[in-house]
């Protein structure tokens, strides 16, 4: 089924259909978009199932279907609203009845650049929160204070700043700081997933600087935060403390190799300097062994990047 045919069937039954998410953002960035995600509104789930009986339901907390469109299995979600009722990213009550509008769905999303939609079939841009303007200016901006309701959005904003070379709006950085407490209870798999993607960026240091600026480095990567302010002999390290040195090294590694494990090794190569007693600075005798001991105990709490 073509995209045009998919939209035509839905529109014939009073529904609206949109391309949403990263595909829209990347198209505006003039970067080749990848997988398309679709959203439908104005139709009940049962009616959708009747129209597309071969669609495979994969969503649990809210309905998401896999539909073959233009030869690819694409995700199709229903427009929905969310209300925070508990801790973390699972603490939401979701409603997705046909009355939910596209604007309401886009409002629940994290940043303006991710809160745009293209309505089919004409691909008319729906941009109630000025995401296109922020993409043009290279700014990551939260749609609303609801940004804080999923704490890992703070890491995602930092990671996307590194990926796209964007800056983070001041208010959004404050929202990131407001995620500090809940971040401590998040599954480490989610945090490491953002780390892995950040290490794939051209300049991974942007990710860590954004976390530091927002005051959440110490709760997401506490061992790294100990490097801040650790002095080094200026004749060997004119760049400054062990933290500045680490960020320079990880960016240098990124310029030499795309291998995530090698970039991770660069990130933690001086980890033991964070444990150096103040009286010993600016020297860090034995920091190599201390770093190995930290990694052995740390193990990134789940798994180290390997590729």
Predicted regions and their residues:
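Catalytic cores of the polymerase beta-like nucleotidyltransferase superfamily
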Residues: 1-307
């Amino acid at each position: 089924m073509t995209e045009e045919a998919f939209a035509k069937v839905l529109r014939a039954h009073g529904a609206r259909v949109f391309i949403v998410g990263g595909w829209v953002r990347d198209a505006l960035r003039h970067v080749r978009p990848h997988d398309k995600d679709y959203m439908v509104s104005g139709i009940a789930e049962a009616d959708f199932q009747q129209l597309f009986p071969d669609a495979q339901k994969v969503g649990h907390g809210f309905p998401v279907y896999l539909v073959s469109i233009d030869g690819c299995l694409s995700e199709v979600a229903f427009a929905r609203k969310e209300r925070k009722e508990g801790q973390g990213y699972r603490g939401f009550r979701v409603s997705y009845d046909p009355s939910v509008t596209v604007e309401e769905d886009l409002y629940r999303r994290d940043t303006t650049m991710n809160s745009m939609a293209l309505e089919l079939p004409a691909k008319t841009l729906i941009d109630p929160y000025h995401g296109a303007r922020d993409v043009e200016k290279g700014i990551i901006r939260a749609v609303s204070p609801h940004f804080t309701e999923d704490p890992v959005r703070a890491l995602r904003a930092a990671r996307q700043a590194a990926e796209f070379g964007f800056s983070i709006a001041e208010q959004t950085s404050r929202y990131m700081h407001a995620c500090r407490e809940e971040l401590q209870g998040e599954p480490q798999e989610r945090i490491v997933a953002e780390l892995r993607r950040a290490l794939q960026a051209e300049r991974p240091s942007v990710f860590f600087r954004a976390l530091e600026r927002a005051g959440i480095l110490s709760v997401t990567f506490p061992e790294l935060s100990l490097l801040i302010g650790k002095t080094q002999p200026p004749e060997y390290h004119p760049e400054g403390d062990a933290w500045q040195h680490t960020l320079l090294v990880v960016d240098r590694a990124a310029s030499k190799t795309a291998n995530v494990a090698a970039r991770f090794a660069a990130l933690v190569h001086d980890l033991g300097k964070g444990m150096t007693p103040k009286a010993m600075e600016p020297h860090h005798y034995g920091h190599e062994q201390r770093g190995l001991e930290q990694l052995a105990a740390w193990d990134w709490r789940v798994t180290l990047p390997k590729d």
